[in-house]
Amino acid sequence: MLDLIAIRRQLHQIPEIGLEEYQTQAFLLSVIEQLCQDKPFIQIKTWKTGILVFLKGYAPEKTVAWRSDMDGLPITEETGLAFASKHQGRMHACGHDIHMTMALGLLEALVEKQSKHNMLFIFQPAEENEAGGMLMYQSGALDEWMPDEVYALHVRPDLPVGTLASNRATLFAGTCEVKVSFKGKGGHAAFPHHANDALVAASYFVTQVQTIVSRNVDPIEGAVVTFGSLHAGTTNNVISQEALLHGTIRTLTHDMSQLTQKRLTEMAEGIAKSFGLEVDVHLKQGGYLPVENNPELADELISFFKESDTINMIECLPAMTGEDFGFLLSKVKGVMFWLGVDTPYPLHHAKMSPDEGAIKQALPEIKAFLEENIED
């Protein structure tokens, strides 16, 4: 039987950023191959630094998938743990070490006997920075074993151990990176009529885009448009020739994201025209679409866990953070849910340290849920 706490601590010590998870992949493969040896109904293959484990059913009518992300973050750990990161400037500060450990625990349970339906375990690299889920899907890595349903979890620091949370709609917002460049004509501050001030135009733009949320977005759906960076000019008495803005869009549905991107682009072009400037708008959503749970499958999952005597299943509001599982859910119906890990520090914090008791508490119930899905 796997020592899941020891496994989690080993994974925690070797965090690697997206598409560089070589040591992580090697460690996972060593455990997976041990679990799957002498099991002729199981196939294993790799994709870049990711891993796919396929459990063929004896009379399959569907394929159910479980996805775990693998990568760490470029953060210097400050937990003081005896098993802290051994990789300088790298940390599992988003709980992906817990995610991988849970997946291995589920795999160990489900390889004991061949089930009726197919089961696919997806160990996915590069969730944090490269939209690895989208890359994996678009490369055709899943084509041979394309799932009909897919499930995943994410640790949540502010929920107690033994609590799971989800909803029947959107769990994570979709994110879109925005870069806008206004180009005008520089000049002396004393002669603005001989110049064309890009900074003034950019200032108008930042103010005007706030009306997208207040006047174009359905208040029930919600959205965020934030510009966290504006760079223009070099000194106090020179009019800026160029202004560069860098921001983000967060929305709870893909349709709302498309609307917000459209209105932002129209505003940038309109302001540029009114000031006689050139403008370039670059929008990058990549694979970070909203995590939109399938209502029917979410209802089944929530109802199942609410029957548990050991798990507290609650229904929650969406989070405005992003997750690349949204891309896979745009292709395959499925559900993501939160796993409470009870720590005072938030995700991506250098001191974030999940309570390992969450693994033992939740694993049997999640195993039972998957077993019901692949045996019905």
From Swiss-Prot:
Alphabetical list of SUPFAM superfamilies matching this protein: Bacterial exopeptidase dimerisation domain (SSF55031), Zn-dependent exopeptidases (SSF53187)
Reactions that this protein is recorded to catalyse: N-acetyl-(2S,6S)-2,6-diaminopimelate + H2O = (2S,6S)-2,6-diaminopimelate + acetate
Pfam families named in the record: M20_dimer, Peptidase_M20
Active-site annotation: D69, E128 (proton acceptor)
Protein's recorded name: N-acetyldiaminopimelate deacetylase
InterPro entries assigned: AcetylDAP_deacetylase, Amidohydrolase, Bact_exopeptidase_dim_dom, Peptidase_M20, Peptidase_M20_dimer
The entry's keywords: Amino-acid biosynthesis, Diaminopimelate biosynthesis, Hydrolase, Lysine biosynthesis
GO biological process terms, semicolon-separated: diaminopimelate biosynthetic process; lysine biosynthetic process via diaminopimelate
Annotated EC: 3.5.1.47
Functional pathway: Amino-acid biosynthesis; L-lysine biosynthesis via DAP pathway; LL-2,6-diaminopimelate from (S)-tetrahydrodipicolinate (acetylase route): step 3/3
GO terms assigned for molecular function: N-acetyldiaminopimelate deacetylase activity
EC category name: hydrolase
Organism name: Streptococcus uberis (strain ATCC BAA-854 / 0140J)
Function per UniProt: Catalyzes the conversion of N-acetyl-diaminopimelate to diaminopimelate and acetate.
Transmembrane domains' residue ranges: none
Signal peptide, first to last residue: none
Family per similarity comment: Belongs to the peptidase M20A family. N-acetyldiaminopimelate deacetylase subfamily.
